[in-house]
């Protein structure tokens, strides 16, 4: 329950895309929030680009997708080449979604849009403010922050670290960041190019010189990412970028007007747990991996989408310990799969073994044409295949639920949605009404087109589903499921 003894419900550390999105969602739900950022302003670099279909769906449910679509370059194809010869071209059009494409939006634009949305909700970023310490005591967290040499103490019901790979929150919690560094140097560059390549096609290229990826940002602007043997200067020059393209990419690409470039090394690391008491970590603070696949920012945004409704219920006195602990239990397997997938992709595209290269160049053209491979590839990359099977607060596979009624910010609170089909008999509906009497403000009922019953979580994932033979006993099963994650005094509303 919200305490008058705390200064804020949620203190968020870090105002990158993940922290900004969490702040927006806290504000949308009416939670008191404070968002601190060590930098003096938002990023001016493009950094992360790809926003995948599941993240677009989440933005839609949060009511903020429109400005992102207006700024995006839409990508619907993935081309795979080896030694400058095309091996495969996969049509990236996942079914069962409103957004069957990848939206390319530079990170500086993403941050600016999220800041604008936060201002509309009455929130703000506290720049030049760093976290010094955080200690949990007496049912809240006492933090010390520093701004321009002055330290102050604050209290929060919860603290969430979205403060990147060098996370202060993670260090304060003494959470090991387990993994390793890739033994290669990477370069990236944003350049203007001629229009040889389609603006809606992402390129994954391999060669004897190493891997290279080309992300289309607009008709003639491209992000180039590649391994490089050694750094030449403080940052890659236009000549270096052109050399990379000439060696590894499809022929005929000419780069000019270098906008931004950088060298960097990458790691694959993750923490063993995402929560310690009332403190949580998300995004790069909790996991980092290869940039091939463009999964980093999307995974972080989905972290906080999983977390925020649980914090909301906890602040309102409805969510219990098991609900909060489910954040780590649900997200860690997803993070592990992302790390494994991006690691495999990096190895496949970057292997220097002649035998492995020959095998790759032979196998990819064959398997990439198989519908089963394309479906799995698209489901993994898009985020639409994420599920929470094995979660302590889910019975079943925990797949995402797609329905137009969950769009455009219509679900502005943290209630479950119980969908009952017309085939449900009177006794089942009576059992649902009795459940309603016990769980007001926690579960919302609607009559659904599909038969049976489906319990959909506030984040759009299915907590429980039963087909067209639903019975009153299924309502009691759902009651037990809800009771395990909420406090008994929780109540529920009805739309019968």
Locate each region found by the language model.
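Helical substrate-recognition/capping region of FAD-dependent monooxygenase/halogenase enzymes
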Residues: 1-9, 13, 28-29, 97, ...
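Core beta-strand elements of the Rossmann-like FAD/NAD(P) dinucleotide-binding domain
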Residues: 6-8, 149-158
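N-terminal Rossmann-fold NAD(P) dinucleotide-binding loop
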Residues: 19-20
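Glycine-rich FAD pyrophosphate-binding loop
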Residues: 27-47
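Active-site-adjacent segment of FAD-dependent monooxygenases/related oxidoreductases
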Residues: 44-119
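Conserved FAD-binding catalytic core of PHBH/FMO-like flavoproteins
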Residues: 70, 116, 158, 162-266
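A conserved short coil-to-beta-strand element within the FAD-binding core of flavoproteins
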Residues: 127-141
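FAD/FMN-dependent oxidoreductases across multiple families
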Residues: 235-299, 319, 341, 395
């Amino acid at each position: 329950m919200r305490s008058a003894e705390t200064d804020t419900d949620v203190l968020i550390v870090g105002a990158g895309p993940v922290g900004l999105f969490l702040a927006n969602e806290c504000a949308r739900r009416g939670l008191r929030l404070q968002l601190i950022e060590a930098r003096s302003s938002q990023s001016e670099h493009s950094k992360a680009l790809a926003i995948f279909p599941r993240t677009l769906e989440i933005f839609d449910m949060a009511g903020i997708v429109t400005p992102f679509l207006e700024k995006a370059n839409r990508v619907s194809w993935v081309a795979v080449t080896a030694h400058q010869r095309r091996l495969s071209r996969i049509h990236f059009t996942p079914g069962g979604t409103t957004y069957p494409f990848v939206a390319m939006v530079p990170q500086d634009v993403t941050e600016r849009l999220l800041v604008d949305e936060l201002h509309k909700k009455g929130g703000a970023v506290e720049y030049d403010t760093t976290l010094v310490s955080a200690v949990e005591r007496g049912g809240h967290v006492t933090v010390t922050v520093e701004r321009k040499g002055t330290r102050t103490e604050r209290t929060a019901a919860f603290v969430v670290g979205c403060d990147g790979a060098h996370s202060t929150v993670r260090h304060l919690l003494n959470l090991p960041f387990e993994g390793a560094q890739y033994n290669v140097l990477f370069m990236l560059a944003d350049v203007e190019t001629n229009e040889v390549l389609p603006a809606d096609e992402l390129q994954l290229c391999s060669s004897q010189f190493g891997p290279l990826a080309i992300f289309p940002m607009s008709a003639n602007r491209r992000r180039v990412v590649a391994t490089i043997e050694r750094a030449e200067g403080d940052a890659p020059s236009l000549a270096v970028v052109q050399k990379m393209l000439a060696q590894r990419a499809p022929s005929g690409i000419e780069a000019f007007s270098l906008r931004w470039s950088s060298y960097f090394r990458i790691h694959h690391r993750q923490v063993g747990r995402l929560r310690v008491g009332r403190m949580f970590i998300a995004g790069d603070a909790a996991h980092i991996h290869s940039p091939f696949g463009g999964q980093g920012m999307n995974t972080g945004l989905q972290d906080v989408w999983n977390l925020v409704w649980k914090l909301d219920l906890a602040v309102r006195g409805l969510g219990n310990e098991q609900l909060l602990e489910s954040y780590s239990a649900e997200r860690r397997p997803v993070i592990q799969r992302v790390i494994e997938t991006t690691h495999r992709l990096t190895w496949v595209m970057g292997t220097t073994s002649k035998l492995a290269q020959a095998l790759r160049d032979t196998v990819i053209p064959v398997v990439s044409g198989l519908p089963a491979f394309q479906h799995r590839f698209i489901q993994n990359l898009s985020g639409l295949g994420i599920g929470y099977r094995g979660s302590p607060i889910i019975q079943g596979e925990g797949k995402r639920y797609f329905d137009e009624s969950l769009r455009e910010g219509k679900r502005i609170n943290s209630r479950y949605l119980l969908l009952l089909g017309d085939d449900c008999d009177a006794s089942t509906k009576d059992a649902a009404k009795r459940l309603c009497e016990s769980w007001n403000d926690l579960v919302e009922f609607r009559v659904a087109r599909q038969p049976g019953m489906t319990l959909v979580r506030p984040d759009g994932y299915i907590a429980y589903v039963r087909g067209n033979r639903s019975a009153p006993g299924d309502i009691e099963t759902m009651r037990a499921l809800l009771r395990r994650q909420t406090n008994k005094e929780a109540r529920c509303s009805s739309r019968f």
